[in-house]
């Protein structure tokens, strides 16, 4: 039956900035013929509560135009020089729906299993002021190489699979189609 169709369809709409969405709705009210490009002038893209850096606009455009798209999100990091001549990677934002404790555990596991060499310590210094995961590096290690390895082997870089379905007048539509209703 129809209920079975709904059960097989999983909606996964990324969170957005409420102010931008309101501006987009006002745009649609003022101009009922506005295009998705017009809306994207107001709604820039997802606004993930854990932050992160969205890589490129392609996945966002696909999601808005077709109702589904793959949005690549990467942790926000800084490379800092320490007084002892070594470097550290500081993670201040992580991709949406990534569990911070599991991320730290995974990095420690990769170091323990010697799948990542060059990390001397990892600790979570997060507090009420915000997220702060500190990854201290050994001497003479290239921080960017370690960082790229972390992106590849951990959830410091993830893909958010947007599936923007809506129920409109009893019909299941992608939000790009629902806007035409």
Model-derived regions: residue spans:
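Short hinge/gating elements
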Residues: 4-11, 84-93, 131-136, 165
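Conserved glycine-bearing catalytic or ligand-binding loops at nucleotide- and phosphate-handling centers
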Residues: 9-69
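A short, contiguous, amphipathic alpha-helix enriched in charged residues
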Residues: 93-117
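Hydrophobic side chains in well-ordered alpha-helices
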Residues: 21, 103-106, 146
């Amino acid at each position: 039956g129809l209920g079975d169709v709904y059960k097989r369809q999983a909606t996964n709409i990324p969170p957005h900035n409420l102010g931008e969405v309101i501006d987009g709705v006002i745009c649609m009210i003022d101009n009922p013929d506005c295009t998705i490009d017009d809306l994207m002038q107001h709604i820039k893209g997802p606004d993930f509560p854990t932050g992160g850096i969205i890589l490129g606009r392609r996945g966002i455009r696909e999601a808005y135009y077709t109702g589904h798209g793959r949005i690549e999100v990467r942790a926000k990091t800084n490379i800092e020089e320490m007084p002892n001549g070594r470097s550290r990677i500081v993670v201040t934002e992580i991709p949406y729906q990534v569990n911070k404790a599991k991320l730290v555990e995974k990095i420690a596991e990769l170091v323990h299993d010697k799948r990542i060499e060059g990390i001397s310590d990892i600790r979570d210094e997060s507090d009420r002021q915000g997220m702060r995961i500190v990854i201290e590096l050994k001497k003479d290690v290239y921080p960017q190489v370690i960082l790229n390895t972390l992106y590849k082997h951990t959830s410091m870089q993830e893909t958010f699979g947007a599936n923007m379905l809506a129920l409109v007048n009893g019909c299941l539509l992608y939000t790009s189609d629902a806007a035409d209703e």
